Curated annotation (Swiss-Prot):
Cytoplasm among keywords: yes
Ligand binding (ATP): K7, T166, D167, T210, G211, G212, I213, S214, T215, K216
Enzyme class: transferase
Gene Ontology BP terms: L-proline biosynthetic process
Pathway: Amino-acid biosynthesis; L-proline biosynthesis; L-glutamate 5-semialdehyde from L-glutamate: step 1/2
The gene coding this protein: proB
CDD domains for the chain: AAK_G5K_ProB, PUA_G5K
Keywords: Amino-acid biosynthesis, ATP-binding, Cytoplasm, Kinase, Nucleotide-binding, Proline biosynthesis, Transferase
PANTHER family: GLUTAMATE 5-KINASE
Family designation: Belongs to the glutamate 5-kinase family.
Catalytic activity field: L-glutamate + ATP = L-glutamyl 5-phosphate + ADP
The protein, known as: Glutamate 5-kinase
PUA domain mapped to chain residues: 275-356
Main localization, broad class: cytoplasm
Length: 360
């Protein structure tokens, strides 16, 4: 049995002058009926609420102010789920709406609860349709058009594959719309991905979405580090949808690492929000990166922010480059007290245990 997550971008769902949003959803749903009939499982991560809300309210360009964005998302979400329900019901498919914000993944308990709910839904042969809760989330509208969320969902349910449907055929060496010499990139191994991502080799400047190719590369990095294969595919081509579910190699394939970091450390690395920062000396940085050691107080040079036990912090080296994230074993006040020599014989105290420390 396979479990796949499919992220459908705004640029796909808005359709064209010839194809309505309902027809787009119809084409997609018909393409995976055979996949589901074999006992496989599917979760959709959908964008499009803001875009559809703007259509409904006759707003011609994507709003810039938060209140209008949230208002159009509220209107569009109703329309979006109505279309999904209408189309999927015709095919005898049951769906469920799941609205998520960053805060829902911020604690281990809530992350696990979301994971259990999603897994139970697919066990019941229900297709969960996940979207960010744009109506109440402010930071969420800058999250990357659901790209990052789709990777976290894939990790939460231990998916085999994450498919990113977009409006380009595959990843390119340059933006093909502005560079005639742009070369398609068909395969990317995890060891190559960070360099490609950091170069930000291409951006898709689509006003209706909040993400471009850069957010999809971030999503691919998150998923592949957690052991999930990622496929970037042009979802505007109906033939591609059929090819995907025949498991054919189209678009760009991002291969997962051979030794995934695991569900818990994936959560630490990508889902949790940090509340402070700890700067390490060179020795401590080497020890946690190369030896898998816990972070001890003796290796700490500086502390920023206020945090209590079990809150998440960013861990950086002397050049302020992120080394890891982790959950602290002591408070910021206690750690500052140790650094200021107000307490003796505490330099070997564990600040972040290696079991709750995830390398960046």
């Amino acid at each position: 049995m396979k479990t796949w997550v499919i992220k459908i971008g705004t640029s796909i769902l808005r359709g064209t002058e010839e194809t309505s949003t309902e027809e787009v959803i119809e084409n997609l749903s018909r393409s995976f009926t055979s996949f589901l009939s074999k006992g496989n499982k599917l979760i959709l991560v959908t964008s499009g609420a803001v875009g559809l809300g703007c259509q409904k309210l006759n707003i011609k360009t994507r709003p810039n102010d938060l209140s209008t964005l949230q208002a159009t998302a509220a209107v569009g979400q109703v329309n979006l789920m109505s279309l999904y329900d209408k189309v999927f019901n015709r095919l005898g498919l049951n769906i469920a709406q799941i609205l998520i914000t960053k805060a829902d993944f911020n604690s281990r308990e809530s992350f696990n609860n979301a994971s259990k709910t999603l897994k139970r839904l697919i066990d019941l042969n229900v297709i969960p349709i996940v979207n960010e809760n744009d109506t109440v989330a402010n930071e969420e509208l800058k999250y990357g058009d659901n790209d990052t969320l789709s990777a976290l969902v894939a990790l939460a349910i231990n998916a085999n594959k994450l498919i990113l449907l977009t409006d380009i055929e595959n990843l390119y060496s340059k933006d093909p719309r502005n560079n005639k010499d742009a070369q398609p990139i068909k395969e990317v191994h995890n060891s190559e991905l960070k360099e490609i991502k950091d170069k930000n080799i291409q951006n898709s400047n689509n006003e209706w979405g909040t993400g471009g190719i850069s957010t999809k590369l971030i999503s691919a990095e998150i998923a592949t580090k957690g052991g999930v294969e990622v496929q970037l595919v042009d979802g505007t081509n109906k033939k591609n949808l059929i090819e995907i579910f025949n498991d054919n190699k189209i678009g760009t394939l991002f291969y997962p690492v051979e030794k995934p970091i695991g569900n818990k450390k994936s959560w630490l690395s990508h889902a949790i929000q940090t509340v402070g920062k700890i700067t390490l000396d060179d020795g401590a940085s080497f020890a946690i990166k190369k030896k898998g050691a816990s972070l001890l107080a003796v290796g700490v040079k500086n502390v920023e922010g206020n945090f209590t036990i079990n809150q998440a912090v960013k861990i950086v080296n002397t050049n302020d480059k992120e080394v890891a994230k982790g959950l602290v074993s002591i408070s910021s006040d206690k750690l500052r007290s140790i650094l200021n020599n107000k307490e003796n014989n505490n330099s070997s105290i564990i600040v972040v245990h290696r079991d709750v420390l995830a390398l960046s």
